[in-house]
Amino acid sequence: MSLNKINFEKLKNIGNMDIKELVKIASKKQVKFKKKDKIPKSVVTLDIGEKYIKIVSGKFLKDKLIIDDCIEAETPKNSIIDGKISNKYMLKEALVNIIDEAGLSGKSAVVTTNSSQIINREVIIPKVEESELETVIRYEIQKYLPINLNNYEIQYIFKEIIINDNNENWVLSVIAFPKNIVKEYYDFLEEINLNPYALDITYNSIRKIYNHSFKKDMQGTVAFIDMGVESANVSIFKEGKIDFTRIIKNGKSGIGLLESYYRVERKKLYIDELTKELERVFKYYSNKNVGNKIERILIYGGISNVKDLKEYLENQLNINVEKISDINNVEFIGKRSKDVMKNKIELYLNAIGAVIRY
C-alpha cells in the first residue's frame, strides 16, 4: 500500500479541530454544530467549571488573536458536575442576563469543558486505507474499554509514524466524547441566546494557546497544569507537540482554599494530596517511554493563586515551576479584558485558547 493513498494532511488537520462540531446525537433528530468552512469572524467562548464560568469574546484572524471582553460568573451550586450540566435551569438563570447585558446574544459560541467521562487514549494501529481508519480505531478502543461506542463521538489526531520489524504503524491520539454531553451543551447554548458553533475540551484549548503564545519560548518537555477547584488537568507537551493528558479529581474540594484561606491544616492536606497525585502522573508518564522527563511546569487556574504553592511544588517535585502571569501575541481591547491581562490571565487561558479557530 502506498503512503500517497492516505491523506496525511487531512489527518493532521484533524488535530487542529475541536471535539467534533458535526455530531450525530442518538435521538430522533441530528444536532450539529456549525460547519468548519464557516468560521465566524468573532466568537464567544465559555469555560464552564464547577465553581466559576469564564466568558471571553474575541476573534482569531490571520494568526492574530484579539480579545474584546472577559467576564467571570459564579457557577450555581451543583449545576455542573464532572463537566456535565446537572441543573440547566439554574445555569441558564445565572448566564442569560450576563450574555444579554454584554451584547453577546446571537453570537457564535464555543464551550470548552472537560470530564472524566471523556476518553482519551493513544493507540497504535497498522497502516490502513483512510476509509478504514475509524473502523480500526473503534476496534482498538473496544478491545480495552467495556463501553458502547455508539454513545460516543470518536475523534482522532495523527501523531507520528513508527517502524517495527519493517512494518509501518501509526500512532494516534483518540478522543471519545459522550454524545449526551454534546447535546446538553448544544441545547443550553441555544437557550441562553447564543449560536452553537463548537465544543472543545480544555486540553485542546490549552494546546492552541500553547502553539500561539508559548511554543517559541519552550524547549524540551513542559507540563501545563490547570489547577481548578474540583480537579487538576495535566497537559504535557514534548518538543512542541501535546504528548499526554490526564485529569486529577480532587479528593477534597479546593473551594476551602479560596473561601476559607485561614484553614491552614485543610489547605496543607489538600495540597499534599494534589502533589502526590501529580507525582504519580509524572512517574507514569516517565515510565511510558525512555527519555520522558518533565523539565518544566507551568501552573494556572484558580488554585494556582494559593500563596507559596509554586515553591512547595518545586520542592516536592524537584522540577522548575512557574505560575503563568502573561501571554504573548495576544491583543486585549476593552477595560475588562485589559484588567484580565494585568491581573487575572491565569484564570482565562482555556477560554482564550478556545477563541482560536482553524
What is each residue range found by the language model?
Residues 1-358:
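Hydrophobic/aromatic-enriched cytosolic interaction surfaces used to assemble or bind macromolecules
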